[in-house]
């Protein structure tokens, strides 16, 4: 403690000071960090805003501020210091070296295009050329040219340089980074000087030569051999004589020959053409513009011109090499002397020639040569630099210069070039994108499926695949069309088109198998021979029609449409041919054979009415014919179907025809089942075994014709809103009579006659049938069935016992079986137990045990008449009834079980006394005893105990 007491103050003060300064430091750090982060965020946000759309990478957002400032420079290029002070920009893949600094700013503000020897690979040559361009000598020479108009004088004034070397101007472009370019630069200034003098003299005359010289200029750019500069664009006037100097660089022969003649003016125009968008256009411009453009304007060279310059560079280089090096040397010092003053005017021309970005290197040498020609006029003659000077195109020129010569030709050009290197990166991915797209189109789709892959191998091109698919679908179509011609050409054609589209879209490979199969319509058609077949065809466009022909294969053609008689006939013929419709025939026949299998007689009768309705009715009302037809129907169902179809075709109230077969079949099946016992073979055969006739047992009395007529009447009435319901039996005989008489010629007539006969002829047969049907009904209605469950089922009242006790015997047997059943967990037979309540109910014999056990059983029936005893007093106790109503009524069965256990009925009092024992023992045996009245009070007691 002493230590703390002694040092307490110092420790506390130290902690305080440490905390204070620590807090201050942390606060300062936090503030500075916050400020820095905020500043950084703002800067990055500004960067992102500026770079939006240009750069997507997040790293660029965090570029150093130096880069930001550097990127900002392009906007302030003109305000920056002389680019000569800066090192040359990085070389592009096509460039070799940057050595010369030829940029010179014109007083007009135009960025002088420094013709850098770096493009040519010789900084010295480039600088000389720059000086030459800027030299007042060039300016003086064009002035002299303008004044004197003598080309040789101008050449002499220009340092006596032979103008033959002007091809150097074009040469400069190819040697953009080579030493040969340097030589070309040297030769170019020589040529440019005489050319400058020449254009000044012949500038007015150059208009005519520009057309000729324009081609030559193209040759100069492309071949470097033509003397006349093809670009007369600078023929705007004598003012552009310095620009003709630019032209001289374009033409290799612009040298001496051009200088003495008007061709010299053409070289001037040629140089302008380089600056202009196209050599032909510059000629026109020069011709159309006799006056020199202001310096502020810059003439842009055609993108194709620098290319031409590049092509002609080699020729120009050769010519330049031919030119005396002394002249080149003389020109170079002159250029150096006046390069600064003259470059401004001349450089814009180069910038214009440089404007074509496509061939940057080619245009650069051309520009270098042209400034050699044009720079001297800039100092001496501002009108000539006017063309050279046009500044609005200069930014484009600068942009062109950078791709051509990243060196600082003009103050504003270098920063653009430094920034532009990213542009070449953008074009690089573009070809990559183009290449995969072309490959994808040329490549076949990948095989994703086995069948698909095989098809793909067969057909590499996707278009080829599609065509084979179409061919395969077309191949399937012709077969389908043949089917449709047999059935319905129109419907099938529509369906085929749908199938084609589906097959094409879904299936990629070639498939010969027809996938569009509609089995369901077949059964529908069977159900309704004609109309449903049509519906099924509609549902299944292609397969529905083929389904009908198989019926035709049997015999009758599938009716594609009720109204198409000719088609049905053709289908019949095709069906006879048995084409394509076998599977459908397999589906169609079964319903009729089923009818025959049920009752051949009934089916024959059915076939006869159907035939009667179709075509057989008018022609075959006889029974024999009917009998023959049913035999045919099971064998060849198409006949009946064809008859149906023909009948539908002839008499199109098909609705009457279609519905009857189904209700008729049902009625036959039900009647046959009811009257199967009484139907006789001869009756069934002759009368076709109508169920009702068999029921009447009057089939012998009735003629088979009448029986058939009754059936036909039923069929006719059923479709006609069930007219038979009034008297289902009588109408049938009336129709049968008419049909057998042959009075009915059509189904409609038969139905009408049948209705008349039904009203007029309710014969005794119909009443007898109704009586028989009523007599047959009571046996199933036997009321004593519930008593059959009792043990004493044999004691049924004799009234209930009938003559034909087949059903009663069955019920009695069931009850007997129930009486022999043993109860679960008791192994006691109901027969042994005579004391059950149900036994008492069923048996007239009373039993004391039952009476005593009534309360326990829970189902008390006071109306019971047991023999008089003391037990009945116990039976009606009200309390057990209340208890039974509340709890005992549902568990009637479990009450029986305890009696079965003891086999001795306990009186109600005994049950109450032994309720505890019963509940304990019964819980194991019968779970329902829990719900007895005895169990409930126990639960109440438990609740009281809990309280």
UniProtKB/Swiss-Prot annotation:
<dbReference type="GO" id="GO:0030479">
    <property type="term" value="C:actin cortical patch"/>
</dbReference>
<feature type="compositionally biased region" description="Basic and acidic residues">
    <location>
        <begin position="749"/>
        <end position="759"/>
    </location>
</feature>
<feature type="compositionally biased region" description="Low complexity">
    <location>
        <begin position="256"/>
        <end position="289"/>
    </location>
</feature>
<feature type="compositionally biased region" description="Polar residues">
    <location>
        <begin position="177"/>
        <end position="255"/>
    </location>
</feature>
<dbReference type="GO" id="GO:0051016">
    <property type="term" value="P:barbed-end actin filament capping"/>
</dbReference>
<dbReference type="GO" id="GO:0045121">
    <property type="term" value="C:membrane raft"/>
</dbReference>
<feature type="modified residue" description="Phosphothreonine">
    <location>
        <position position="729"/>
    </location>
</feature>
<feature type="compositionally biased region" description="Basic residues">
    <location>
        <begin position="888"/>
        <end position="899"/>
    </location>
</feature>
<feature type="modified residue" description="Phosphoserine">
    <location>
        <position position="57"/>
    </location>
</feature>
<comment type="subunit">
    <text>Interacts with RVS167.</text>
</comment>
<feature type="compositionally biased region" description="Basic and acidic residues">
    <location>
        <begin position="488"/>
        <end position="502"/>
    </location>
</feature>
<feature type="compositionally biased region" description="Basic and acidic residues">
    <location>
        <begin position="526"/>
        <end position="541"/>
    </location>
</feature>
<comment type="similarity">
    <text>Belongs to the AIM3 family.</text>
</comment>
<feature type="compositionally biased region" description="Pro residues">
    <location>
        <begin position="862"/>
        <end position="879"/>
    </location>
</feature>
<protein>
    <recommendedName>
        <fullName>Altered inheritance of mitochondria protein 3</fullName>
    </recommendedName>
</protein>
<feature type="region of interest" description="Disordered">
    <location>
        <begin position="1"/>
        <end position="332"/>
    </location>
</feature>
<feature type="compositionally biased region" description="Basic residues">
    <location>
        <begin position="36"/>
        <end position="54"/>
    </location>
</feature>
<feature type="compositionally biased region" description="Polar residues">
    <location>
        <begin position="633"/>
        <end position="644"/>
    </location>
</feature>
<feature type="compositionally biased region" description="Polar residues">
    <location>
        <begin position="354"/>
        <end position="367"/>
    </location>
</feature>
<feature type="compositionally biased region" description="Basic and acidic residues">
    <location>
        <begin position="70"/>
        <end position="84"/>
    </location>
</feature>
<dbReference type="InterPro" id="IPR031370">
    <property type="entry name" value="Aim3"/>
</dbReference>
<dbReference type="Pfam" id="PF17096">
    <property type="entry name" value="AIM3"/>
</dbReference>
<feature type="compositionally biased region" description="Low complexity">
    <location>
        <begin position="93"/>
        <end position="105"/>
    </location>
</feature>
<feature type="modified residue" description="Phosphoserine">
    <location>
        <position position="58"/>
    </location>
</feature>
<feature type="compositionally biased region" description="Acidic residues">
    <location>
        <begin position="59"/>
        <end position="69"/>
    </location>
</feature>
<keyword id="KW-0472">Membrane</keyword>
<feature type="compositionally biased region" description="Low complexity">
    <location>
        <begin position="667"/>
        <end position="676"/>
    </location>
</feature>
<feature type="compositionally biased region" description="Low complexity">
    <location>
        <begin position="313"/>
        <end position="332"/>
    </location>
</feature>
<keyword id="KW-0597">Phosphoprotein</keyword>
<feature type="region of interest" description="Disordered">
    <location>
        <begin position="354"/>
        <end position="810"/>
    </location>
</feature>
<feature type="region of interest" description="Disordered">
    <location>
        <begin position="824"/>
        <end position="904"/>
    </location>
</feature>
<feature type="modified residue" description="Phosphoserine">
    <location>
        <position position="64"/>
    </location>
</feature>
<feature type="compositionally biased region" description="Polar residues">
    <location>
        <begin position="763"/>
        <end position="774"/>
    </location>
</feature>
<feature type="compositionally biased region" description="Low complexity">
    <location>
        <begin position="130"/>
        <end position="163"/>
    </location>
</feature>
<feature type="modified residue" description="Phosphoserine">
    <location>
        <position position="476"/>
    </location>
</feature>
<feature type="compositionally biased region" description="Pro residues">
    <location>
        <begin position="379"/>
        <end position="395"/>
    </location>
</feature>
<feature type="compositionally biased region" description="Polar residues">
    <location>
        <begin position="466"/>
        <end position="475"/>
    </location>
</feature>
<feature type="modified residue" description="Phosphothreonine">
    <location>
        <position position="861"/>
    </location>
</feature>
């Amino acid at each position: 403690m002493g230590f703390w007491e002694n040092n307490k103050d110092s420790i506390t003060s130290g902690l305080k000071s440490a905390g204070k300064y620590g807090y201050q430091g942390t606060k300062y750090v936090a503030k500075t960090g916050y400020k820095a982060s905020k500043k950084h965020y703002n800067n990055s946000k500004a960067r992102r805003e500026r770079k939006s759309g240009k750069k997507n990478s997040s790293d660029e957002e965090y570029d150093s501020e130096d880069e930001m400032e550097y990127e900002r420079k392009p906007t302030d290029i003109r305000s920056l210091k002389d680019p000569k002070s800066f090192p040359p920009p990085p070389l592009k893949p096509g460039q070799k070296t940057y050595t010369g600094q030829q940029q010179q700013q014109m007083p007009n503000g135009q960025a002088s295009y420094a013709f850098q020897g770096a493009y040519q690979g010789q900084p010295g040559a480039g600088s000389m050329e720059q000086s030459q361009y800027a030299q007042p000598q060039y300016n003086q020479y064009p002035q002299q040219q303008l004044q004197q108009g003598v080309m040789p004088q101008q050449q002499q004034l220009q340092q006596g340089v032979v103008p033959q070397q002007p091809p150097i101007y074009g040469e400069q472009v190819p040697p953009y980074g080579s030493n040969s370019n340097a030589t070309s630069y040297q030769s170019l200034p020589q040529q440019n000087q005489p050319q400058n003098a020449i254009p000044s003299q012949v500038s007015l005359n150059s208009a005519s030569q520009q057309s000729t010289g324009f081609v030559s200029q193209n040759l100069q750019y492309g071949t470097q051999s033509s003397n006349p500069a093809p670009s007369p664009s600078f023929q705007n006037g004598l003012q552009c004589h310095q620009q003709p100097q630019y032209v001289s660089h374009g033409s290799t022969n612009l040298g001496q020959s051009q200088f003495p003649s008007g061709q010299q003016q053409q070289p001037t125009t040629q140089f302008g053409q380089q600056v202009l968008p196209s050599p032909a256009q510059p000629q026109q411009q020069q011709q159309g513009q006799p006056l020199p453009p202001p310096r502020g304007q810059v003439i842009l060279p055609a993108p194709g011109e620098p290319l031409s310059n590049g092509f002609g560079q080699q020729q120009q280089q050769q010519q330049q090499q031919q030119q005396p090096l002394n002249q080149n040397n003389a020109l170079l010092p002159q250029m150096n002397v006046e390069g600064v003053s003259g470059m401004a005017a001349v450089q814009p021309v180069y910038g214009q020639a440089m404007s074509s970005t496509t061939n940057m290197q080619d245009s650069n040498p051309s520009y270098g040569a042209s400034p050699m020609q044009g720079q001297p006029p800039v100092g001496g003659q501002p009108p000539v630099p006017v063309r050279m000077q046009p500044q609005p195109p200069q930014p484009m020129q600068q942009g062109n210069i950078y791709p051509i010569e990243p060196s600082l030709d003009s103050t504003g050009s270098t920063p653009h070039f430094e920034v532009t290197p990213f542009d070449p990166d953008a074009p690089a991915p573009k070809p990559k994108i183009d290449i995969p797209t072309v490959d994808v189109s040329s490549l076949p789709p990948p095989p994703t499926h086995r069948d698909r892959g095989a098809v793909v191998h067969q057909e590499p091109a996707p278009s080829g695949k599609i065509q084979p698919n179409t061919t395969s679908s077309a191949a399937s179509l012709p077969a389908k069309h043949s089917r449709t011609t047999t059935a319905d050409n129109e419907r099938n054609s529509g369906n085929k088109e749908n199938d084609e589209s589906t097959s094409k879209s879904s299936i990629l490979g070639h498939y010969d198998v027809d996938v569009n199969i509609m089995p369901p319509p077949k059964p529908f058609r069977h159900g309704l021979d004609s109309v449903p077949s049509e519906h099924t065809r509609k549902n299944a466009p292609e397969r529905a029609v083929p389904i009908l022909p198989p019926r035709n294969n049997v015999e009758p053609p599938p009716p594609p449409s009720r109204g198409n008689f000719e088609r049905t006939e053709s289908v019949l013929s095709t069906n006879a041919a048995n084409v394509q419709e076998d599977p459908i025939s397999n589906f169609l026949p079964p319903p009729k054979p089923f009818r025959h299998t049920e009752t051949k007689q009934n089916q024959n009768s059915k076939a006869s009415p159907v035939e009667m309705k179709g075509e057989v009715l008018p022609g075959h009302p006889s029974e024999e014919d009917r009998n023959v037809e049913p035999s045919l129907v099971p064998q060849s169902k198409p006949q009946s179907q064809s008859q149906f179809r023909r009948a539908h075709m002839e008499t199109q109230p098909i609705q009457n025809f279609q519905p009857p077969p189904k209700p008729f079949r049902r009625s036959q099946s039900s009647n046959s089942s009811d009257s199967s016992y009484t139907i006789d073979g001869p009756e069934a055969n002759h009368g076709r075994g109508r169920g009702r006739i068999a029921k009447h047992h009057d089939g012998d009395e009735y003629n088979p014709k009448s029986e058939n007529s009754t059936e036909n009447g039923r069929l006719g009435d059923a479709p006609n809103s069930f007219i038979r319901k009034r008297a289902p039996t009588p109408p049938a005989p009336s129709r049968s009579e008419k049909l057998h008489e042959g009075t009915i010629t059509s189904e409609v007539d038969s139905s009408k006659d049948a209705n008349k006969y039904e009203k007029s002829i309710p014969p005794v047969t119909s009443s007898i049938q109704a009586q028989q049907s009523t007599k047959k009904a009571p046996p199933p209605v036997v009321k004593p069935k519930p008593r059959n469950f009792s043990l004493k089922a044999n004691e049924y009242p004799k009234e209930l016992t009938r003559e034909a006790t087949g059903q009663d015997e069955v019920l009695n047997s069931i009850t007997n079986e129930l009486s022999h059943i043993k109860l679960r967990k008791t192994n006691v037979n109901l027969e042994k137990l005579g004391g059950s309540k149900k036994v008492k109910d069923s048996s007239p014999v009373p039993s004391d045990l039952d009476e005593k056990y009534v309360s326990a059983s829970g189902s008390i029936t006071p109306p019971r008449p047991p023999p008089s005893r003391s037990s009945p007093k116990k039976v009606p106790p009200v309390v057990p009834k209340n208890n039974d109503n509340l709890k005992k009524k549902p568990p009637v069965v479990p009450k029986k079980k305890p009696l079965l256990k003891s086999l001795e009925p306990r009186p109600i009092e005994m049950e109450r006394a032994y309720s505890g024992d019963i509940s304990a023992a019964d819980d194991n045996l019968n779970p329902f005893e829990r719900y007895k009245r005895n169990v409930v009070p126990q639960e109440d007691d438990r609740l009281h105990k809990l309280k």
